[in-house]
């Protein structure tokens, strides 16, 4: 019995030792194979001869020579050289390039072969700055015909402090009424047009650099209903302010997404000097894409609205309806803007309309005020379409849209009081 027990114990110990020996052998074999998986190949004689004849120093990309190789000399793979200390410096054109230090041989010193042999070995892994250029920014060079100027600014909203941070960066291509231009900018947070913040006056320049920062205290509940307005003026010798143009920027939800500030540029628009119509005016764009059979309407803003007195919160929206043979086809609505007789929307809507339907189709844009409860009140309406339904400016707007396919045609229209179709 004792002999059998001794045999069992001896067999168990022997088996464990055998397993340990096998495991150690496997580990050593894997390490040995890993050292032979990749290895750098020596430079070709052509490389050495060329480098010596040109008087160049030894460079970090040249591999160390070895007397014996464990692999055939025709292996078409080498380990790319490690590039260290590579610095990048910014260029004035908005591109980035590496510093002058060159850790690799010049391309003319390396023989080039179509078979991808050892002559291209040192170029593997090198960075080509041409592949990492930033796209050219044409916002400072491309100005449309009749441009009044362009304004750059930044917007950031601090949710916890309920502060709107506005950065006035610069303006370019300002069109002054005289030879010299001395611009300043007034900032409003609509619908409040009584209070404003003002920049410093820049003397004798049509391309002023402001770099000023302004703070508006505004609640997070109403921030998406506000509109940032920039009015750019020229200050003449009598210190009178002459309006050069303005920019309206609605603070929609997508504008304030994220914690970082957003840099924007906008072209200046001329302020309409015509007095508001009896029931107010509505500005919108029309465009038709004949290839996609798509009719696009961009509701921009309204002015001089006759709001109905109401104890509740006043909000105004625009309803856009597509009609065909005076029959309702489809309707879309803008978001409601609170407490302003000059609301700004900047919202785009698209309708499906074949080219054969445009002779009988029309668009009805109705400005509606929300009342207490579920009630609403029409403030005014404008209809644009072919000769069958409209005349005057409304017909001209429709015809201009058809004559300029795929272009946005913008116009003001007077609202008229009429019953809803």
From Swiss-Prot:
- The gene from which this protein is expressed is SYT15
Q: Which GO terms describe its cellular component?
A: exocytic vesicle; plasma membrane
Family, as annotated = Belongs to the synaptotagmin family.
Topology Cytoplasmic: residue spans:
30-421
Q: Which Pfam families match?
A: C2
The C2 domain is annotated at 147-264, 278-399
Q: Which domain of life is it from?
A: Eukaryota
Positions on the Extracellular side per record topology: 1-4
Q: Where is this region: Disordered?
A: 47-68
Keywords from UniProt, A to Z, are: Cell membrane, Membrane, Repeat, Signal-anchor, Transmembrane, Transmembrane helix
Which lineage ranks, top first, belong to the organism behind this chain?
A: Eukaryota, Metazoa, Chordata, Craniata, Vertebrata
How does it associate, per the subunit comment?
Homodimer.
Q: Report what the protein is called.
A: Synaptotagmin-15
Presence of keyword Membrane: yes
Q: What is known about what this protein does?
A: May be involved in the trafficking and exocytosis of secretory vesicles in non-neuronal tissues.
- Record text about domains: Neither C2 domains mediates Ca(2+)-dependent or -independent phospholipid binding.
Q: Which InterPro entries match?
A: C2_dom, C2_domain_sf, Synaptotagmin-15/17_C2A
List membrane-spanning regions: 5-29
GO terms of molecular function:
calcium ion sensor activity; calcium-dependent phospholipid binding; SNARE binding
One of the GO biological process terms: regulation of calcium ion-dependent exocytosis
- Give the species: Homo sapiens (Human)
């Amino acid at each position: 019995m004792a002999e059998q027990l001794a045999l069992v114990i001896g067999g168990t110990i022997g088996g464990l030792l055998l397993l340990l020996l096998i495991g150690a052998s496997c580990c050593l074999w894997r390490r040995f194979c890993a050292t032979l998986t990749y290895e750098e190949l020596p430079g070709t004689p052509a490389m050495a001869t060329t480098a010596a004849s040109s008087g160049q120093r030894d460079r970090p990309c040249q591999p160390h020579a070895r007397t014996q190789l464990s692999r055939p000399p025709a292996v078409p793979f080498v380990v790319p050289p490690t590039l260290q200390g590579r610095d990048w410096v910014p260029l004035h054109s908005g591109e980035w390039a590496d510093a002058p230090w060159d850790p690799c041989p010049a391309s003319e010193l390396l023989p080039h072969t179509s078979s991808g042999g050892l002559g291209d070995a040192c170029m593997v892994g090198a960075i080509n700055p041409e592949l990492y250029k930033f796209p050219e920014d044409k916002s400072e060079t491309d100005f449309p015909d009749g441009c009044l100027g362009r304004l750059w600014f930044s917007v950031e909203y601090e949710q916890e402090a309920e502060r709107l941070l506005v950065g006035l960066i610069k303006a370019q291509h300002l069109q002054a009424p005289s030879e010299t231009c001395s611009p300043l900018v007034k900032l409003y947070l609509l619908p409040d047009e009584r209070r404003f913040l003002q920049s410093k006056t820049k003397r004798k320049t049509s391309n002023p650099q402001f770099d000023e920062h302004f703070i508006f205290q505004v609640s997070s509940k109403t921030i998406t209903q506000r509109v940032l307005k920039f009015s750019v003026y020229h200050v003449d010798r009598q210190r009178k302010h002459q309006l050069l143009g303005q920019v309206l920027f609605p603070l929609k939800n997508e504008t304030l997404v994220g914690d970082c500030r957003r840099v924007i540029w906008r072209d200046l628009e001329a302020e309409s000097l015509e007095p508001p119509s009896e029931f107010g005016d509505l500005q919108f764009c029309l465009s038709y894409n004949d290839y996609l059979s798509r009719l696009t309407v961009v509701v921009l803003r309204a002015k001089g609205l006759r709001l109905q007195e109401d104890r509740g919160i006043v909000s105004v929206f625009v309803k856009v309806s597509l009609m065909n043979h005076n029959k309702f086809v489809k309707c879309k609505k803008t978001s409601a803007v609170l407490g302003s007789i000059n609301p700004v929307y900047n919202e785009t809507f698209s309708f499906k309309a074949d080219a054969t339907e445009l002779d009988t189709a029309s668009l009805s844009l109705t400005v509606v005020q929300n009342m207490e409860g579920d009630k609403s009140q029409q403030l005014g309406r404008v209809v644009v379409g072919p000769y069958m339904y409209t005349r005057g400016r409304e017909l001209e707007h429709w015809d201009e849209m058809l004559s300029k396919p795929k272009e946005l045609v913008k116009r003001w229209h007077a609202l008229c009081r009429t019953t809803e179709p």
